Amino acid sequence: MRILVSACLLGYNCKYNGKNNYNSKIVELLKEHEVVPVCPEMLGGLSCPRIPCEKVGNKIMDKEGNDCTKQFIKGAEIALNIAKEKQVDFAILQRRSPRCGYSLIYDGTFNGNLIVGSGIFAQKLQSLDIPIMEAESEKFV
């Protein structure tokens, strides 16, 4: 199987703070599969480290009030093209992210509050009917 994975979960230092969300259980489960790592934020041209971003209405804003929507959309489209080119079977994404969150995302207040919703990249994967699992599902914790 070909599985698209948020690169931060595999140990790539691509999070906003320059770190990662390495998940040893995910890495172990993926040993027998073809892994396709992506970080839509980096693909969209955002730096690492960078100012944290959250979805505010229909835009992605950083904590200082800068609009990062174009970079998020660009990165999501590039990552989606990679998913299509590699013909991935499903995706494992980082929860809560404004790009990869699938069931819950931060609410745009930068206070750690969550709301029901999906990030830009998760929405694009859903439009192609690519199944999504979140890194914090019972299977990976």
Tell where the protein language model's regions lie, with residue ranges:
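Short N-terminal binding/cap micro-motifs at the start of the first secondary-structure element
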Residues: 11-18
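Extreme N-terminal starter segment of soluble prokaryotic enzymes
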Residues: 1-3
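Divalent-metal-activated hydrolytic enzyme cores
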Residues: 43, 53-78, 82, 113-141
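Short, surface-exposed acidic-centric catalytic microdomains
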Residues: 21-62
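Internal, conserved structured core segments that host functional sites
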Residues: 94-105, 109
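Short, well-ordered beta-to-alpha junction loops that form the rim of enzyme active sites
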Residues: 8, 94-97, 137
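Short amphipathic alpha-helices and their capping/turn segments at secondary-structure boundaries
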Residues: 22-36, 75-90
